[in-house]
Amino acid sequence: MSKAFASQADLDVKQVSFTKLSDNAYAYTAEGDPNTGIIIGDDAVLVLDTQATPVMAADVIRRIREVTDKPIKYVLLTHYHAVRVLGASAYKAEGCEYIIASHDTLDLIRERGEQDKASEIGRFPRLFQNVESVPPGLTWPTLTFTGKMTLWLGKLEVQLLQLGRGHTKGDTVAWLPQQKILFSGDLVEFDATPYAGDAYFKDWPATLDNIAALQPAQLVPGRGAALTTPEAVAAGLAGTRSFIADVHEAVKAGVAAGKDLNAVYKDTMARLTPKYGHWVIFQHCMPFDVTRCFDEVTQYPDPRIWTAERDVQMWKALEQ
């Protein structure tokens, strides 16, 4: 292989930021690593995405405890990926009663959760360096919904919304309508490359339109710094939209020209690297993103299951 697989060469510890967006909303970010959102209500706390392991989740909990002693009653899984959900067990000791996800996310956990767990542990050795702290099995939602669910944390309204397919078929955002703060999960990234190995390229732009229609004043992306002004939110949405569209257009052009996946990948890398090559995990994501986009454009409307074995086979084929 001409370059290290996925994020196996990414061993540098990232600097954590704990950003206050309002009296009720915080963002746990770490220089492009997966983010966690925190919503503090009158009587309970909701955590959005758990971190990759209970050891990593413990740092989130430590920072929450610096600002509130209220029980962490709710954990929301914005989607099914292991790097987002396998820290969930750490929150049980902090009062967690409900693990919430869309029913579409539950379907994905049932269908491909085990394969994704093995795959992501191989892709992200730094994030999973304490993988022994993850209990056996998977993180299972205990409460699911379709379309929309409203939680009342005392007087604070929290809307959990499915605004369309994009990063996965089960993506959920959390919306504080009283404060116009949105937690997007991996539907939006900022200065970080969208992972699109399980994506719906044709649908993702319309889902971003639905996010924009809410007119968030602040937004916590899946990766990257919290966006704390409407201008920053617009930039985050625009960057994500541009990347998804550019990959899609490059792949469609290659397929129309009769090129195979390997040639399409090389063309797409050449086309996108000048614009996005400085984004976090660009080199990691692109083989997966182009492969999925090629699948969608040619013969697979729904994403195929990634396994640890398929990961390595694909990487060797595209990066040799």
Protein language model regions, located:
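Divalent-metal (often Zn2+) His-rich catalytic cores of metallo-beta-lactamase-fold enzymes
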Residues: W175, D203-A263, D267
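Core dinuclear metal-dependent hydrolase active-site scaffold
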Residues: T144-L176
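Active-site HxH/HxHxD metal-binding segment of metal-dependent hydrolases
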Residues: R62-T150, K169
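Active-site environment of divalent metal-dependent phosphoester hydrolases
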Residues: V55, Y80-V85, L106-R110, T168-D171, ...
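Active-site neighborhood of phospho(di)ester-bond hydrolases with catalytic His/Asp-centered motifs
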Residues: L48-T50, K73-H81, I100-H103, L163, ...
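Conserved beta-strand hairpin/beta-sheet module of binuclear metal-dependent hydrolase folds
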Residues: F18-R63, T172-D186
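C-terminal regulatory/interaction regions
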Residues: A256-Q320
